[in-house]
């Protein structure tokens, strides 16, 4: 299951840059990769002016490309009243002062975990299918885990390698591939070793 994400996602970014055809190609590509019914166009409601344009375009793309919509909320804190605390934490994280008008901040106070009733009030009249699809995803993702038990993935290692040697080898190969050289500069090797 995959979605087109918030305004920071690739498809919304293409829409905001005016490249609707590029956004449609990307959406089609993700749908092909994930399989029919597993890729969703994601509409949201927030204080960012560009969101309305992106939502309108995503609804049109949904019809044109036969891709399902979901309604989500970009949640960064639990309650709407936590917006001020979130803003303060952003200041701590970025080393900014709350009084600095030019600092990084979220627009509005609607990045909280909205209730189902709030989501229905926002999307229920115009895009009820987006909420139904969101619930379908939740139903598909439902999992029950036994408390007190660790669930770790199985990760088979090549013969003769430990986790440490395997990770080191894969990281070194990735560095060489990314830099397109068999002999990365010493400062890169030192940073890789540090990491």
Task: Please place each PLM-identified region on the residue numbering.
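Phosphodiester-processing cores and adjacent nucleic acid-binding clamps
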Residues: 1-195
């Amino acid at each position: 299951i995959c979605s087109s994400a918030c305004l920071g996602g690739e498809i919304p970014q293409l829409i905001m840059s005016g490249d609707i055809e590029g956004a449609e190609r990307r959406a089609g590509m993700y749908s092909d990769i994930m399989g029919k019914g597993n890729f969703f166009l994601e509409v949201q409601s927030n204080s960012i002016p560009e969101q309305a344009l992106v939502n309108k375009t995503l609804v049109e793309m949904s019809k044109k490309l036969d891709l399902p919509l979901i309604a989500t909320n970009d949640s960064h804190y639990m309650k709407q009243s936590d917006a001020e605390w979130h803003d303060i934490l952003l200041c701590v994280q970025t080393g900014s002062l709350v009084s600095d008008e030019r600092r990084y901040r979220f627009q509005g106070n609607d990045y909280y975990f909205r209730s189902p009733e709030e989501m229905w009030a926002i999307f229920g009249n115009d895009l009820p299918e987006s909420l139904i699809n969101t619930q379908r995803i939740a139903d598909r993702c439902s999992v029950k885990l036994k408390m007190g038990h660790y669930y770790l993935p199985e990760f088979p290692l090549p013969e003769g390698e430990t986790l440490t040697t395997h990770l080191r080898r894969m990281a070194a190969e990735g560095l060489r591939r990314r830099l397109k050289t068999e002999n990365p500069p010493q400062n890169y090797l030192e940073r890789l070793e540090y990491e």
